[in-house]
Amino acid sequence: MKAIVFAYHDIGCVGLNALAEAGYDIQAVFTHTDNPGENRFFSSVARVAADLALPVFAPEDVNHPLWVERIRELQPDIIFSFYYRNMLSDEILSLAPQGGFNLHGSLLPQYRGRAPINWVLVNGETETGVTLHQMVKKADAGPIAGQYKVAISDVDTALTLHAKMRDAAQELLRNLLPRMKEGPLPLTPQKEADASYFGRRTAADGEIHWQKSAFTINNLVRAVTEPYPGAFSYLGQRKLTIWRSRPLDLVHNKLPGTVLSTAPLTVACGEGALEIITGKGEAGLYVQGDRLAQEMGIVTDVRLGNKPSNTLKRRTRVLILGVNGFIGNHLTERLLQDDRYEVYGLDIGSDAISRFLGNPAFHFVEGDISIHSEWIEYHIKKCDVILPLVAIATPIEYTRNPLRVFELDFEENLKIVRDCVKYNKRIVFPSTSEVYGMCDDKEFDEDTSRLIVGPINKQRWIYSVSKQLLDRVIWAYGVKEGLKFTLFRPFNWMGPRLDNLDAARIGSSRAITQLILNLVEGSPIKLVDGGAQKRCFTDIHDGIEALFRIIENRDGCCDGQIINIGNPTNEASIRELAEMLLTSFENHELRDHFPPFAGFKDIESSAYYGKGYQDVEYRTPSIKNARRILHWQPEIAMQQTVTETLDFFLRAAVIEKTAAPKDELNA
């Protein structure tokens, strides 16, 4: 059987040797050149390939059409990936009739993503393993050919566990590869509900937070000890690295980070204490804990912790245009919870952000972006991060007021983009899931999916193309003039304060608010085209946490990125959303304040939205970028979001009803 191999690291060497032992006809080996900045403790795939007299390549982009064509010419029957660090394109995977298989260092679907060996230790797991699975478009998500379990001991480090995983990979491949030569193996689909994802780790992730338990900190130490950069803390400005430690079940009344003793060197944690067995100080020598204390002048009752800043760092100034809107007010709440941020906001109303008006870190001006251009330009110049959240984003307006949509969503926002270029300010721009249009991919990918819209006479696409054109303009400014930007694409965020019932009364609201209005007023719930359209609903708190991490932008990780923010597991049709709402409504404690349910009513989209409307059957995000870049995973189930959103609007409706007679008397 002819095979193409993509491999790196020790596991890559194991995989290559296992294929050779099993008698595979290896046509070519693709690997990576060594990174001089990486502590390379593992064997070389290139050397193993050379010893086996195999052709070996290390292209910068193996998915380039030239390399795809060269692989096509080799006519592989099967493709293997063993710790190769780049995703292989669908085009490459389609070249092998038997498909492509990847060896992953965990028991999938748990610990998808990067650095699974380090992560299982950080999280204190007692078992892991290796998985051979078929490669699909979504990373680490394909059906499983086989697994081999590995026990994790209390004293395992990343290096010792790596050795166990290497042996496990060898055993798994010795079992599976000969059978795969005889014919396709039965594959077991992964359970998405059990999946977890962990992103890339950096040296900075080794910083110790002493308020955590001694057990948790010790897990970090063994996860990142040699050959990795190590867990570290600071004594004033001086850094110390911990190579080996031991958690102690010790009761104390000291603040976390306080040195309890120097021989042995023991530090108070949020729960228990940590004995530092070996480490290094600024001299760089590997020494015992008590010697480390002597070298660094550590004494009892001194505190270890974060490196103090030499200068008083001012707060990051965030300008939010449309601060009173759904995303704007929730984002403001999250930013003001962190004393690193100061928020400047503009909007035509203030009902949703009135709760922040007394906060000294919040500055608000009531105004219209089309009128207050001088105020906006001044504050773009003054602030650090700019979020232009002002837009018409309700579907009925796309056909009812297409020119107004274009003028506000494109023309006014283009001015803001150009001011960001002019003053060299970072822009975090709200793109939209609408830009994907009628994309035919199973999951909409920021980097590869086609953006497909309808004909010109379908005016509903004016919002989509206005946003898409701004995305392209921002990208071009980034490439040509160095604009710092991040584009984020929300997928059906919902929660309290999404639109309001007055907007729903004139049809200018999102789906859930419109459905709630029907329940509140006792009118039939109108299901456009039967409500068969599916969407992935995302809780506002999940969405805001991702957006907060984009604004935070650790190590510039979000610069020049496009990031979908959605929850693929919360997919439901509009009819299913309506039924879920109805169930929660009937069980709500305020149910008696509202009329009887008037039933469902199917209605054609043209009758509801008018001529020029065209709908999309489904809209499912790929969130690999959010997981990889932000280390973010949506957590809140749709039922919880629906319940909280309904509760917010029902309580608001009751207050509105009880206030009405007073208003009439005052009149």
From Swiss-Prot:
GO terms for molecular function: carboxy-lyase activity; UDP-4-amino-4-deoxy-L-arabinose formyltransferase activity; UDP-glucuronate dehydrogenase activity. NAD(+) binds at residues 347, 368-369. The active site is at residues 104, 434, 619. Keywords: Antibiotic resistance, Lipid A biosynthesis, Lipid biosynthesis, Lipid metabolism, Lipopolysaccharide biosynthesis, Multifunctional enzyme, NAD, Oxidoreductase, Transferase. Residues 1-304 are annotated as: Formyltransferase ArnAFT. Residues 314-667 are annotated as: Dehydrogenase ArnADH. GO terms for biological process: lipid A biosynthetic process; lipopolysaccharide biosynthetic process; response to antibiotic. Pathway: Nucleotide-sugar biosynthesis; UDP-4-deoxy-4-formamido-beta-L-arabinose biosynthesis; UDP-4-deoxy-4-formamido-beta-L-arabinose from UDP-alpha-D-glucuronate: step 1/3; Nucleotide-sugar biosynthesis; UDP-4-deoxy-4-formamido-beta-L-arabinose biosynthesis; UDP-4-deoxy-4-formamido-beta-L-arabinose from UDP-alpha-D-glucuronate: step 3/3; Bacterial outer membrane biogenesis; lipopolysaccharide biosynthesis. In the N-terminal section; belongs to the Fmt family. UDP-L-Ara4N formyltransferase subfamily. HAMAP family: ArnA (MF_01166). Homohexamer, formed by a dimer of trimers. Bifunctional enzyme that catalyzes the oxidative decarboxylation of UDP-glucuronic acid (UDP-GlcUA) to UDP-4-keto-arabinose (UDP-Ara4O) and the addition of a formyl group to UDP-4-amino-4-deoxy-L-arabinose (UDP-L-Ara4N) to form UDP-L-4-formamido-arabinose (UDP-L-Ara4FN). The modified arabinose is attached to lipid A and is required for resistance to polymyxin and cationic antimicrobial peptides. This is Bifunctional polymyxin resistance protein ArnA.
